[in-house]
A protein has these predicted regions:
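Peptidyl-prolyl cis-trans isomerase
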Residues: 88-133, 164-171
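PPIase-associated folding chaperone regions across multiple families
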Residues: 1-81, 108, 128-209
Length: 209
């Protein structure tokens, strides 16, 4: 057990040291843009297009219809009731403090989306195409501003929307930056490893000058 703890400590120390070395190699947004361009075919093949549209952060409260037809679709009455509840909740919020915090509280109390209810309805770093079309269209309306609200109907139900903020970068940039840094880490690790000779015996492995 002692040797295992020592191994873990060495791994943590080595990882931290590698990160320090990587951090010492500055890069610019132009470097990331060039990295994307150099690998554009690969990114495009994965549906990651270069775009000026930045990622966004949005809160929502999902109100699902309750009541289905024999074919499994929601009844008209169920849709109408869900729409009314969504409008009533939005009006209640507008007549109250109408802050992002109060919206988050309302989401935690009312949203039927298990993926965001515990986080006040928040979805961060949404990029075009991540959500269903109607949700997506509302989020990326060019006129959208922080604090905007609205109601959107999707196949899941009615979404009471709150636009929180626009992110710093577009999705392609974040993905390219992540890949760039991963490659940089590998390159730095190889540079460090090349400075040392490793003994062939795994049992007596050691690093020597």
């Amino acid at each position: 057990l002692t040797s295992y703890h020592a191994f873990v400590e060495r791994q943590i120390t080595a990882s931290a040291y590698l990160q320090v070395l990587v951090d010492e190699k500055p890069y610019t947004e132009d470097d990331i843009s060039k990295y994307y361009d150099d690998n554009a075919d690969s990114y495009a093949g994965n549906g990651i297009e270069k775009s000026d549209v930045k990622m966004v952060n949005v809160r929502h409260i999902l109100i699902q219809p309750e009541g289905k037809n024999d074919d499994g679709t929601y009844t008209d009455e169920a849709w109408a009731e869900a729409e009314k509840k969504a409008n009533d909740l939005l009006t209640e919020w507008q007549n109250g403090e109408h802050t992002e915090d109060s919206f988050a509280f309302m989401a935690a109390e009312n949203s039927q989306d298990p993926g965001s209810v515990e986080n006040g309805g928040l979805y961060e770093d949404i990029y075009p195409g991540k959500m269903v079309d109607e949700f997506d269209a509302w989020c990326f309306d060019p006129a959208r501003q922080p604090g905007d609200t609205g109601i959107v109907k999707t196949s899941y139900g009615y979404h009471i929307m709150y636009f929180s903020s626009t992110g710093e970068h577009a999705y392609w940039y974040v993905r390219a930056e992540e890949d760039y840094l991963n490659e940089l880490s590998v390159s730095v690790l190889q540079e460090v490893a090349a400075k040392f000779e490793v003994t062939e015996s795994e049992q007596n492995a050691a690093i020597v000058d």
